[in-house]
């Protein structure tokens, strides 16, 4: 997490738990840094790079193209062994066990005088069985001063999970990035704002230690412009389709990948869904419930966005939300969505079994049901 230094120097704040893990990187051939968007994993890699300067080469993966990524990797290694780079390029990105074996031997045979750390940022974009097998086979078997640091938003490979569990790979997960109440106090102090324990606990309760949310809370304390910052820095940069997905997730409260696939909520593949859910600043994953939801700090903003959106512009979103609630047997929530966009046929065509609608036939819901009856 960056600090607003009065001298203009780019300072990165790293909590003690994370610093202790980063200090172990030189002891491993392979390091996996795994955390969703907004936790500061790229900043952590930058912190390590700053401390090791000439020993680090960073590859920023910007697309799912494995060929472009592999050529960038070859070029990075070519700065130290041009012959190895030529051999690797002649093989190309590994497509089978034979390729993996050849590439593995070429990398293992590179000899360096000094340590070399290859940081691969956004590795999740090119993660695949072949390269994961290669990386896993190199873990603990290099002995040539080359280290790979894989920075990713999520792990979708059992191969990588198995390698992490074997102990041959240094794993730095989300739990090391989450701020404690003490971390929050220290971060505020370094940014010129002292807070007490009660205030720190309140911020932690709202943000759950999520780095980006804490940054927004700090900005809100300095000037009451949190929603404007969310809009200008985060929201306005999103595509219309992404905005619709986030509004839908806010309305339906939470969702699992399985539910999305079973209910056909999205046309995205499971891999595309994992990428979207784990690289959005707005979304968090509840490990206890195994469900994705909107982060608390963004809920008021999204509620206002939905309220301000014209009926016709959010018709598709509310229709999808209503359909999800119907499949969940939450008819009352579904009717609220359909009512807002005058979808009377969907309300009266739902025909719920009595035992499913009975729980919501309560006095506090009387006015809403009377509206449905009068306005149909």
Each language-model region and where it sits:
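Conserved NTP-binding/hydrolysis module of P-loop NTPases
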Residues: 67-90
């Amino acid at each position: 997490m960056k600090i607003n230094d009065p001298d203009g120097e780019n300072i990165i704040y790293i909590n003690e738990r994370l610093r202790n893990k980063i200090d172990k990187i030189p002891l491993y051939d392979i390091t996996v840094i795994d955390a969703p968007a907004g936790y500061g994993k790229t900043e952590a890699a930058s912190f390590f790079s700053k401390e090791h300067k000439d020993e680090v080469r960073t590859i920023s993966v910007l697309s799912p193209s494995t060929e472009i990524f592999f050529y960038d990797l070859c070029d990075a290694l070519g700065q130290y062994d041009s012959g190895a780079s030529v051999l690797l390029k002649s093989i190309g990105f590994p497509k089978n066990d034979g390729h993996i074996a050849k590439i593995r031997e070429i990398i293992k045979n590179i000899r360096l005088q000094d340590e070399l750390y290859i940081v691969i940022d956004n590795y999740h974009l090119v993660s695949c069985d072949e390269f994961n097998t290669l990386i896993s086979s190199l873990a603990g078997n290099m002995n040539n001063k080359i280290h790979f640091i894989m920075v990713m938003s999520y792990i979708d490979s059992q191969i990588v999970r198995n390698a992490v569990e074997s102990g041959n790979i240094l794993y730095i997960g989300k739990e090391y990035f989450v701020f404690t109440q003490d971390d929050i106090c220290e971060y505020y102090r370094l940014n010129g704002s002292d807070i007490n324990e009660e205030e720190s606990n309140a911020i932690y309760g709202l943000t759950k230690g999520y780095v980006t949310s804490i940054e927004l809370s700090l900005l809100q304390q300095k000037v009451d412009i949190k929603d404007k910052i969310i809009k200008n820095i985060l929201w306005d940069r999103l595509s219309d389709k992404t905005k619709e997905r986030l509004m839908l997730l806010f309305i339906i409260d939470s969702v699992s990948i399985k539910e999305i696939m079973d209910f056909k909520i999205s046309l995205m593949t499971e891999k595309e869904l994992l990428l979207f859910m784990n690289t959005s600043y707005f979304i968090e994953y509840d490990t206890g419930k195994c469900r994705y939801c909107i982060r608390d700090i963004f809920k008021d903003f999204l509620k206002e966005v939905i309220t301000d959106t014209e009926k016709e512009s959010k018709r598709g979103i509310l229709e999808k939300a209503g359909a999800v609630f119907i499949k969940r047997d939450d008819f009352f929530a579904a009717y609220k969505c359909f009512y807002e966009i005058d979808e009377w046929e969907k309300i009266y065509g739902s025909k719920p079994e009595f035992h499913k609608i009975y729980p919501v036939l309560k006095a506090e819901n009387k006015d809403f049901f009377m509206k449905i009856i009068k306005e149909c």
